[in-house]
């Protein structure tokens, strides 16, 4: 019973780890496009079509 619980716990941890990697690749698209995540109040940059972690930031190429 204890072994079954440990296997289940390992499965849950692996599932969390893989979902976290998918989330990080989604937010690294800005860096791959040559941009950086900046606050929306910054001026003088062109906005790129990529997502940032914070909803108050956008992907910006200076």
From Swiss-Prot:
Signal peptide per UniProt: 1-20
Gene Ontology CC entries for this record: extracellular space
One biological process term in Gene Ontology: defense response to bacterium
Keywords: Antibiotic, Antimicrobial, Defensin, Disulfide bond, Secreted, Signal
Main location as per UniProt: secreted
Any one GO molecular function term: CCR6 chemokine receptor binding
Cysteine pairs bridged by disulfides in the record: 30-59, 37-52, 45-60
Location within or outside the cell: Secreted
Family membership: Belongs to the beta-defensin family.
Function: Has antibacterial activity.
Protein's name according to its UniProt entry: Beta-defensin 33
Organism: Rattus norvegicus (Rat)
Gene transcribed to yield this protein: Defb33
């Amino acid at each position: 019973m204890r072994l079954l619980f440990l296997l289940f716990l390992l499965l849950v941890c692996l599932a969390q780890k893989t979902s976290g990697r998918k989330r990080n690749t989604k937010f690294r698209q800005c860096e791959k496009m040559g941009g950086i995540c900046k606050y929306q109040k910054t001026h003088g940059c062109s906005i790129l079509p990529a997502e940032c972690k914070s909803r108050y930031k956008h992907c910006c190429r200076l």
